[in-house]
Every structure is written in structure tokens, then in C-alpha cells.
């Protein structure tokens, strides 16, 4: 099965089992807008809780806020979004399709890396145990030629982005012979910049209304509340402010399911530090955030850092944590050193003093900021991609199972009476009542037990508890484990402790060493 076929199966699975639906589907949907179903919203909330608790609950110097989506329009002038929040877009004249020019080049660069790795793998198979990978990379003419070409284009690309040279960006696309995936032609328009902010009107009449924006990021709500939080919370630098909230971007090229959407949710933390210490903290947060991802157990090799070729107008350092999706390595989280740009700019535009008096140094200054920003929807897709598993079983049977970390699973326990009589449903319902105050539990009596197991596998439920005839005799139930399908007899009164041990966030938090 190709990665593209796997991704299509994953998207279909999300809809079939109540994770993600196309929005407004009865009206044929709305491009790049999706709704989360009954299982999707539970998974999403669990991801958010894992982030919030690890960020706020486990750090004494980080607190949370919930800022409004609508903000004074001057906020976005000060932040630079009105003038500089753009994407470089290019159209193919034959297919009439529009693409991000920078993404086309990034994908070409990634293909060169893939070519090199294929050459290395072929050589590894050819030479066997005697293969010296480092020497081969240095001496192979084909690898050297591809690497040199890649490095040359990468430098031109980085220079073009930093100089905002749209003509050079188009020329790179031409020189690399990048073709439209739809038409197969290289008949490109000029590259143009498009602002990504949604605007609307606030006011009772159109004549008296003022233009405001749907926020394109949640960070600015934190910055404008810096002094409110610092003073009321008596916070001392270094400290952080965290927020989870919706943001909106008029993405011209929205694709890959929920990976890139026009309405999305962010989990951001802005960490305020003394000027001159920001790079140390930036490196510290890089390590903390990578550990957070790897604690989920999806394989360390599926994550990597990717430093930015072009820094945003507010940053002096930036890197992404990328995950190996079915469509390749893509960003799930960014860690940025934002300097004092945001607070300094808001101080300038508002005319209000936004500074911190440091009792340790006896001086006042505008703090520097280190940001961690993760997309909830991308994280959701990462978890789904990693968890989705197709297994061939003995006897020619097969199953689809979502191997979520138990703490993130939408449903923790399914309670199943073996038959719908003989008092088994009543006992099963009592078990549900015992567990439901602490865990998301479902009761299911429809179809055979085997079919019910498969249904729970498909939504990622870690435990299936079956009430049978023996339960009525000795108070034990059959517990089936999702990943291994192994079964064991457990006393009803021991169920809570068993579920707690496997499904608690503590198992994840202990791996973070916070």
C-alpha cells in the first residue's frame, strides 16, 4: 500500500467512525473546513489536556489566559500582520491551480534528499556488511552531484526568501523544472503576495462600522495582556503565559485534510525572559517540546527539527518540530525566539509603557520572548496517522485498530454484556456507573462480542470489559486489551485501579522529567 492510499484510508476512517466530518456536508461542504465528530472531539480535548497540564499544571511559573478572538485593529498593525502577513503564490496557467511558491521549492528540495537516500540504500544492499556509508556519501559521483545541486538551490531559495525576491523565487521554480502536479506543465504566472487575514465589519451600520480582523494567531492576545497577568499574578521573570484558542487564515492553498485549514486551533505559550538570555531558553524549550512529542511513543525517528530558511519579521531564531506524516515530514510545532519585537511594538503603537522592573538587576526593560506554538488540528492528524494500524490475524481475519496512547483515547472502557438477558445488562450498567465519573465509558450490547471488539478497536478503546455468566457467580469480568487482544479475568472492584494505571496522564508526564 502506498502512503497516498494509506492517507485516503485514514481520511475515510475518520469520517466512518465519528472523528472528522466535512463541514456543512448537506450543502456539499465548504473548502478546507471540517467538523469534529463525537470521537474526534474527545481525542482533541485529550490532546489539549495533555498540552495544558504539562505546560501550566507542571510549571509553577506558567499561567493561562483565554483572550478574545476580536481585538482592536491597531493590534494587527503593531504586530506587523497588516503589512507583512503574506504568502507567495503562483498559478499554473494550464490547470488554473494555485500553489505556494515556497512550498513547491521545499518539496523539490525534499525530493533531492530522497534521491540521495535511495542511492545510499541501494549501495548498502550491494556492499552488505562492508558498506561504509560516510565514505560512500563523500565519494559517490551521483550522490555528490545531487547534493551539490540541492545545496545550490537551497542557498538561492533562502536568499530569495530573505530578500523577498519574488522574481528569483519564480526563476528557481523554472530552473528546477518544477511542473504542476495536475497539468504536468511548467507554464507558470509571476509570483504574487497574498495577505492571509480575514476582515469583517464591527458596528450597527455599514457607514459607521470599523474594519476588524479575525485573529490570525493567538499570540497577540497574550502580549497585550502581559502587564495584566504579570501584575495581578505577581509574576517574576522568567515566566510564561499559555493559551488555547481558534485562529483564522485565508489560506489560498488549503489541502491535506485537516493539516492546513482556514479555521484552526492553536496551543501557544509565550515565555518572557531577560534580554540576552533568550537563546539559552530557546534551546531549553526546543528540548522540552521534543520530549513532549516523543513521550507519546510514536517513534523517535519520526520527529526532527527543521530550522527556518527565512526568519519572520519578529524572530532572531526559529525551528520547527516536524513529524513524518503519510505525505512526508511536515511541521507540527514551531519554537521561535521573538526578541522584544511584539512588546516593543505594542508599546510604540499604544503609547503605553510595557516594561518589567527586574528586582535582581534593579533595571526596567522590555522582556524578550520565546514562543512555542503547536496546531491542535495538526497534532490531531499526527496522532491519528501514528495510531492507525491494519493487522492481519490468524485464520485470514484482519482488523483496523487505532493504537492511541491510552491517556489520549476518546473512550477508555467499553462495557459489554455477553447477552441481553440473565441480569448481565444490569451488572454491566452498574460497572459503567462506577467508572463514568473518572473516565469516558460506553455501554454496548448490539451485535456479537467479536463485532463489538472490532468496533472498539476501530475507535481506539484500550479496554473492553465483558460481563458473562461467571460474573454473576464470582464478581469477575473478562478484560480484553486493545493492542495485544489478550484477555484476563479481573474482579470488578479492581477495574478502576487497572484503568487508572494505564490511562492516567501521569504515565506521560513521568517521561517528561519536569
Regions found by a protein language model. Give the residues of each.
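NTP/phosphate- and nucleic-acid-binding module
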Residues: 1-514
Amino acid at each position: 500500500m502506498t502512503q497516498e492510499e494509506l492517507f485516503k484510508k485514514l481520511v475515510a476512517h475518520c469520517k466512518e467512525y465519528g472523528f472528522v466530518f466535512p463541514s456543512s456536508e448537506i450543502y456539499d461542504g465548504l473548502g478546507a473546513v471540517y467538523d469534529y465528530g463525537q470521537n474526534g472531539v474527545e481525542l482533541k480535548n485529550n490532546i489539549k489536556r495533555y498540552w495544558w497540564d504539562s505546560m501550566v499544571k507542571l510549571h509553577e511559573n506558567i499561567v493561562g489566559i483565554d483572550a478574545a478572538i476580536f481585538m482592536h485593529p491597531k493590534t494587527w498593525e503593531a504586530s506587523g500582520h497588516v503589512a507583512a502577513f503574506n504568502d507567495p503564490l503562483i498559478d499554473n496557467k494550464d490547470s488554473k491551480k494555485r500553489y505556494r511558491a515556497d512550498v513547491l521549492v521545499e518539496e523539490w528540495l525534499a525530493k533531492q534528499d530522497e534521491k540521495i537516500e535511495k542511492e545510499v540504500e541501494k549501495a548498502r544492499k550491494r556492499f552488505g556488511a562492508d558498506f561504509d556509508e560516510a565514505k560512500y556519501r563523500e565519494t559517490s559521483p551521483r550522490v555528490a552531484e545531487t547534493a551539490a545541486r540541492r545545496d545550490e538551490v537551497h542557498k538561492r531559495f533562502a536568499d530569495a526568501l530573505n530578500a523577498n525576491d519574488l522574481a528569483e523565487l519564480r526563476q528557481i521554480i523554472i530552473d528546477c523544472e518544477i511542473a504542476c502536479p495536475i497539468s504536468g506543465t511548467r507554464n507558470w504566472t509571476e509570483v504574487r503576495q497574498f495577505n492571509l487575514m480575514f476582515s469583517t465589519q464591527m458596528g450597527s451600520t455599514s457607514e459607521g462600522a470599523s474594519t476588524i480582523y479575525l485573529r490570525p494567531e493567538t499570540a497577540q492576545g497574550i502580549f497585550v495582556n502581559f502587564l495584566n497577568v504579570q501584575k495581578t499574578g505577581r509574576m517574576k521573570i522568567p515566566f510564561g503565559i499559555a493559551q488555547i484558542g481558534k485562529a483564522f487564515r485565508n489560506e489560498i492553498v488549503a489541502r491535506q485534510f485537516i493539516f492546513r485549514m482556514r479555521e484552526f486551533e492553536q496551543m501557544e505559550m509565550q515565555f518572557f525572559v531577560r534580554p540576552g538570555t533568550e537563546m539559552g531558553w530557546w534551546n531549553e524549550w526546543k528540548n522540552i517540546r521534543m520530549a513532549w512529542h516523543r513521550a507519546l511513543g510514536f517513534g523517535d525517528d519520526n520527529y526532527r527539527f527543521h530550522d527556518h530558511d527565512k526568519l519572520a519579521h519578529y524572530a532572531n531564531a526559529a525551528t520547527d518540530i516536524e513529524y513524518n506524516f503519510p505525505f512526508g515530514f511536515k511541521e507540527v510545532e514551531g519554537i521561535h525566539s521573538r526578541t522584544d519585537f511584539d512588546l516593543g511594538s505594542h508599546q510604540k503603537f499604544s503609547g503605553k509603557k510595557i516594561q518589567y522592573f527586574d528586582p535582581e538587576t534593579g533595571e526596567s526593560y522590555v522582556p524578550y520572548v520565546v514562543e512555542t506554538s503547536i496546531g491542535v488540528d495538526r497534532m490531531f492528524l499526527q496522532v491519528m496517522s501514528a495510531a492507525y494500524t491494519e493487522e492481519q490475524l490468524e485464520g485470514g481475519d484482519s482488523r483496523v485498530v487505532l493504537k492511541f496512547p491510552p491517556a489520549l483515547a476518546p473512550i477508555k472502557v467499553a462495557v459489554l454484556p455477553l447477552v441481553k438477558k440473565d441480569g448481565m445488562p444490569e451488572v454491566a450498567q452498574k460497572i459503567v456507573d462506577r467508572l463514568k465519573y473518572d473516565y469516558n465509558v460506553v455501554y454496548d450490547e448490539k451485535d456479537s462480542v467479536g463485532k463489538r471488539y472490532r468496533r472498539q478497536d476501530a475507535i481506539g478503546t484500550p479496554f473492553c470489559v465483558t460481563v458473562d455468566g461467571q460474573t454473576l457467580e464470582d464478581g469477575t469480568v473478562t478484560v480484553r486489551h486493545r493492542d495485544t487482544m489478550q484477555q484476563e479475568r479481573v474482579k470488578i472492584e479492581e477495574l478502576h485501579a487497572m484503568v487508572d494505571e494505564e490511562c492516567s496522564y501521569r504515565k506521560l508526564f513521568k517521561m517528561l522529567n519536569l
